[in-house]
Amino acid sequence: MKLNIMQSIQITAVLSLLICSPLWADTVSDFQNSWTGRALDLQRKIDNHTPMSENNILGTHNTYNSEVYRACNFSVGCRYLDPQQEYSIKDQLRMGARFIELDVHWTAKMENLFSYPKRLLLCHGLCSLNDKYATEGFNEVKAWLEDSANQDEVIILYIEDHSDGRHQDLYDQITSRFGNRIYYSGGCQSIPSTLTKNQVLAAGKQVVVWKDGGCSGNSSMKNMAFTGLGEIGRVWEDSTTIGTIGEIFNGGIERITANDVRNGFAQGHNIINLDNMNTSDGRIAAAIWSWDQNEPNNLNNEDCAMQWGNGRWNDANCSNQYSFACKNVTDGSWVATASTGPWAYGSANCQALGSQYIFEVPTNSKDNQALKAAKEATGYDKVWINYQDQSTEGQWLRSE
């Protein structure tokens, strides 16, 4: 069989794709179906009723600055040569990032050989004529939000504003993608310290927009974007080459490690923004403070949650006899009852301690550690918590 030159080139290109492209399943899908992915999904729902200023939230730093988008063009140069992420914006969301950071610049974009208009682009440091449009980043967020599996998710979208005052353009681009999903600020204010994810979802919304740079003079942007995080704390790292060089002269900072994630949440940090978020370095798994490894497993119809000796959770038979986790709603402290009983007796046993006590479930790592200490002070190694899936298997709920 004779092949012409073009056929040979096409066959070579196809073979190259087959050789270079991974033949295994999507690693992000594998992660989502793993225990870590499922446990994080369950954990994100625990704190829906509590203020976001008390939540533990994984995010990514400079979400758009990913090696996935790295490219060079003969006429316009290279983009994202010093990346901080390995995956696309959408895949970072799929891995559990709920704080997304996009740096939007009003800068030149080469649209053809003779056209270099200014556009809103996503760029880090020195912008390139080849950088992606801001709308491309918004489109990835939009695609993730529209997935039926994500209708109960809430994200914070942080816009680092270098738009040179093009706030109407920026507003139009954001709202045309997911305007009906945005929880509006209503004016120049930080995110309220009492705002919960349940409140956002009850309004039919999913996106809380924070734009830095102060209050916008544009009425539309002013009414949509929050101007600060308020009492929500945030820590981040900078793994770029430029950032590393800066550390040499500034005395250096440690990278965020798995232990940093674990200890940071235990100390009460709200948002931890990772560079190079991936499924294999242990930092995502370190964000899990609730369910123990391979739990819940519904062994022998276990439908009620308890905390055991190491502070992690297990699903147990609801008729087992354990102490009860009671939270003081006045000062936020925890007590483990001296009395024991089946899970259903939790509310009554906590109320017996006083009207300020309720049968409760920890909603962040710091609270979970406080309950562990209270349990140990009582002399027990197991305690019931107010969390169960008795009505529908796998749908874990806090009983009101």
Model-derived segments and spans:
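Extended amphipathic alpha-helical segments with heptad-repeat/coiled-coil character used for oligomerization
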Residues: 195-197
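Extracellular, disulfide-bonded carbohydrate-recognition/adhesion ectodomains
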Residues: 204, 214-400
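Bacterial N-terminal signal peptides that target proteins for export
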Residues: 2-11
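Active-site flanking residues adjacent to catalytic metal/cofactor-binding acidic residues
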Residues: 100-102, 385
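Acidic, His- and aromatic-enriched active-site or binding-groove loops in soluble protein domains
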Residues: 176-190
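Surface-exposed patches in mature extracellular/periplasmic domains of secreted proteins
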Residues: 102-105, 154-160, 185-186, 357-365
